[in-house]
Structure formats: C-alpha cells, structure tokens
Amino acid sequence: MFAIVEEPLDVGVLIQDAQRPDCGAVATFVGTTRIDESEGAAVEYLEYEAYRPMADRKLEEIGAEIEGRWDVGHVSIVHRLGRVGPGEASVAIVVAAPRRGPAFEASRYAIERIKEVVPIWKREVWSDGYVWVGSQIGTRDQVSGFR
C-alpha cells in the first residue's frame, strides 16, 4: 500500500497487512510530531501539503526501488496531509522480510528517499509564527509548475 491520506494513520492495520508466513521480520517506522523548542517556541502542530499526482507516483517508485534492492515480502508507505498535532503520526513505513536486516535497511531507505524526492512539504506552526521546512529537491512552486 502506497497512499497519501488526510485522516489519522492506523499503524496497527498496516502491520497486520504486512504479516506473511514467509517473513520473519516486520520493521516499522512511524514519524510523529514532536514539541521542538529549537526556534524559541514549542511547535503547536505541523501542517503537510503535497503535490498529489507526483507524490503518489514517487511513493510507488520508492516501493519498487525497495523491492528491487532487498528481499522483502511487503512494503507499505503511508503519509498524512493536513494538520498533525504533537504525538500524532505523519508517516508510517512497514516492511516485511524473511530476515530483520533487510527489513530495517529498507525502512530506513524509505524514509530517507521520501525526504529526498516526494513533493510533500511541512510547515511548523508555533504560537507566534511558522516556517516551512524540508529538504526535497525543488520548491512547492517548482514541482507544481507555478513560478
């Protein structure tokens, strides 16, 4: 499953869907909103936006990259859009593999690739302002065709 959703993530369902009789490992990565006071104020929430047509395609491409590189039986990547409060999940990656090494490596690869190539942008919102953060290649306007 590769999806971009606007509702809270149900990681339990993703783990259940990943279980296979030929896989002895299920590695899960869940990215959550943390209260980070590095900018002088606590983060109240994160807000995610995406260029949907490309983001959907890029998640599927990452899944194909993983399947071509590691011996895995299942890959799920789900990213949430909209407002995500402290402690809530914004991204879930679940990889099932015959052995734990490939499962861990593939899940780490997935989150790093998401940050590199998937056009999803995060806005950190504090009580006194906000900032857009991210390291994707290109800006929101460049990816969506606006200048």
Language model segments and positions:
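N-terminal, polar/charged subdomain of small-to-medium soluble alpha/beta proteins
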Residues: 1-90, 96-108, 112-147
